[in-house]
Amino acid sequence: MRGHLRRRLWTVPLCASAVALTAAVGPITSSSADTITTTACNNRTNDTVAKLVECIRTDDLWNQMKAQQAIADAHPDAGGHASRNSGEPGYKAAVDLAVKLFKASGYHVTVQTYTFPYFAFFGLPGGSEVSPTPTTFTLGTDLNAFNSVGTVTAEVQPVGGIILPPTPTPSSSSGCSPADFAGFTPGNIALIQRGTCNFGEKAKNAVAAGAAGVLIFNEGQPGRTGLAGGGGMIDSAGNSVVPNIPVGFVPFAEGEHLNNAANAGQHPQVKLDFKAEADPNRDDFNVIADSPFGDPNHTVVVDAHYDAIFGAGMLDNASGSVTLMDIAQKLAKVRTKNRLRYILFGGEELGLLGSDYYTHNLSPTELAQIGYDLDADVTATQNYTIGVLDPAAKNLFGGPIPVFPANVYEPSKFARDEAVKYYDSIGLNHEFFSPQGTDAFWFNMVGVPASGILTGQDCCKTQEQVNLFGGQTGNFEGNLGTTDGGCVDQPFRWCDNLSNNDPNVLTFETKAFAKMVFKMAFDTTILTRTPQQAVAARTAAEQQKAARMAGASHAPMS
């Protein structure tokens, strides 16, 4: 699940792998033995919800999870880590497997290709202060790396606009103007204070001035002293910036120290070593599988994102993808009233790229045909919560609640309430969450009602959630009992592997999602729109997107 700008403000772990722990929460609803065989399920038509749910088998789900892990293991990234990341061989191999599965089940399959700016580090970025105080920077404590490539050892030269001591409120515009680089010596490392403009704008100006590297340091006010930054950068126009020189971020104390050393004539030197691969036009893929049954003018999209980030991505989101594919197999023979369209999206971890591309490249008629979206995003969390998607619910990332077209709110309750009824029937509580950070977001934005499921990731499970769902406070997954952030989406941990999932949670979550899918496959109240209404909603979404990008150029990435 994507959060913020895919949580590109990095924190880096003290260890490189998760500790395998027994799940803190015992499932309430799944029996230890399945009551029907895979063969029996595949040979019959599961044309009632009871038949479908009966055929959701732990063994089937877990075997598919093992297959996804095997793909990741067989296709490591350039650093040797198991990978299903977009733009890498592991993801393409996973796409090929999904295509084979859908075709074998009788679906009409299309692989939709789009391009995106690919970036990946080889191993761990590093750096050190060579002089006047030799110090090796610890990644995640002393240094964060922006998406940039290069190795340099050079003198550090402060640029214009640095304000020390800092003013009570942020005011530094260091590096925001080419004029700040007047007199800069090409080949030096530019020392720039955080503030006013985007990190990417500062980096662009440094590159234009001939810098061989960049160190941006925190500005120094309360709350702006420690480590920040890292990950992707954008310029003032909202364009991605990936310099061919290393660009790092250091805490205020290190920046102030280097600035003072330079002003004292000590000629401080720093080494930065960021090995990476960048490709501005890497192919990525969405897998689209249409049922041969059902009314195409009343299409229900069932989606999950298929890509990973920083590794195998088994909880986020092989689990949701397996939930989707298992249901697709079990429903393949059913003559549904509405057409089911299963989509495995790429690029979700990088900013909902696949669903953005898909929803914005449908013809007006195609967009108007889609009456509903169901999203499965993280369905096997060990220390779980039970989340049900509702566009009116809270933003899990703490930001403002998105405003969607008015027509999505009431219909989104159709499937939402079906999930709630199921959880109530098996004695599980639930909580509602906004689609922000999921692929359902773009469907809601273009006026398509949506719901879905989520079981939690990263950190931190609250005491209130423990009271609802059991388990323990702290990480939802990964190193349980701690607050280190877990495995999902965490840079340089590579620990979101098969062991980071609970097969029993995966089973009862897939059953819940199966009931939602079956409900919408036969629902007669799905809202329909004219092509003109659909395009109007999409145009409004594009305008909101442009406004967000314009706003982002002023504060969030600086």
Please annotate each region the language model reported.
Residues 2-33:
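Secretory targeting and sorting signals
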Residues 58-80, 86, 98-105, 193, ...:
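Catalytic-core environment of secreted peptidases
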Residues 296, 335-336, 345-462:
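Metal-dependent peptidase/peptidase-like ectodomains
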Residues 460-538:
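His/Asp/Glu-rich mid-to-C-terminal helical/loop segments that flank catalytic regions of hydrolases
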Residues 86-88, 137-251, 429-430:
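Extracellular/luminal Protease-associated
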Residues 33, 47, 66, 70-187:
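Noncatalytic luminal/extracellular "stalk/propeptide" segments of secretory-pathway proteins
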Residues 104, 240, 330-353, 376, ...:
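Short helix-loop-beta-strand segments that form the rim/entrance of peptidase-like active sites
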Residues 145-175, 237-315, 326-329, 337:
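Soluble metallo-hydrolase cores and metallopeptidase-like ectodomains found primarily
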